[in-house]
Curated annotation (Swiss-Prot):
GO molecular function: ribose-5-phosphate isomerase activity
Record's protein name: Ribose-5-phosphate isomerase A
Gene: rpiA
GO BP, one annotated term: D-ribose metabolic process
Catalytic site: E108 (proton acceptor)
Substrates-to-products reaction catalysed: aldehydo-D-ribose 5-phosphate = D-ribulose 5-phosphate
Source species of the chain: Prochlorococcus marinus (strain NATL1A)
Length: 236
């Protein structure tokens, strides 16, 4: 196992260690979240964790959790989530995030917003000084509106194109049946709070991948002298 995967596994386990009996859990998407789901399933099977139920943020996560025997509920059936755990594509010093590399950010944001506590699990490569310098910002749009939205986003300084599928012809289609525009802002994103609102106010936009003022704790996998460890970053 390479060092990056070791870091992912370490933070996934550290997040699962915070789960208590009887919790309603938000189970995130992506490679690190998948490791977290697997670690949770092991603890449930051993009896170390009892009476928990998960709310998944993607169809992929739902399939994995179901196969591993984790009890699930739909998002619409819960009024509150005790703890949500998810990965991120970028994390800035103020705990603002870009998510949506897996095109699941709409459900991910709904789950994070409903959680009493939202933990983000990442390896150290995901920590950045400024968002969007290296990772594009995904914006989910109605299929009939993508051209109109694309033109409007140019006025906000964002240049973007449809995310295309790798193993089929045509664009990526989200779990909600929409399309993704991946945006780049020339100098990165200076004001995530403002930009999140501006983008979501554009007709035809369902949601964007900026997660603003949602994160309570970031668990970071780090390597020092070839030893993998986990650092907990919390808001002051």
């Amino acid at each position: 196992m390479d060092l990056q995967n070791q870091m992912k596994k370490a933070v996934a386990q550290a997040a699962v260690d915070q789960i208590q009996n009887g919790m309603i859990l938000g189970l995130g998407s992506g490679s690190t979240a998948a490791l977290m789901i697997e670690a949770l399933a092991i603890k449930i099977k051993s009896g170390e964790i009892k009476d928990v139920v998960g709310v998944t943020t993607s169809f992929q996560g739902e399939v994995l959790a179901s196969e591993l025997g984790i009890p699930l509920k739909s998002l619409s059936s819960v009024s509150e989530i005790d703890l949500a755990i998810d990965g991120a594509d970028e994390v800035d010093p103020k705990f603002q995030l870009i998510k949506g590399g897996g095109a699941c950010h709409v459900q991910e944001k709904l789950v994070a917003a409903l959680a009493k506590k939202f933990i983000v699990v990442v390896d150290s490569t995901k920590l950045v000084e400024k968002l969007n310098l290296d990772f594009k910002l995904p914006v989910e749009v109605l299929p009939s509106a993508w051209k109109q939205v694309q033109k409007t986003l140019i006025n906000l300084g964002g240049e973007g194109n449809l995310r295309m599928a790798q193993k089929k012809a045509g664009p990526i289609v989200t779990d909600q049946g929409n399309l993704i525009l991946d945006l780049t802002f020339r100098n990165g994103i200076d004001q995530p709070e403002l930009l999140e609102t501006q983008i979501n106010n554009i007709p035809g936009v369902l949601e964007n991948g900026l997660f603003v003022n949602l994160t309570d704790e970031v668990l970071v996998g780090k390597v020092e002298s070839d030893v993998v460890g986990v650092e907990s970053l919390k808001k002051i």
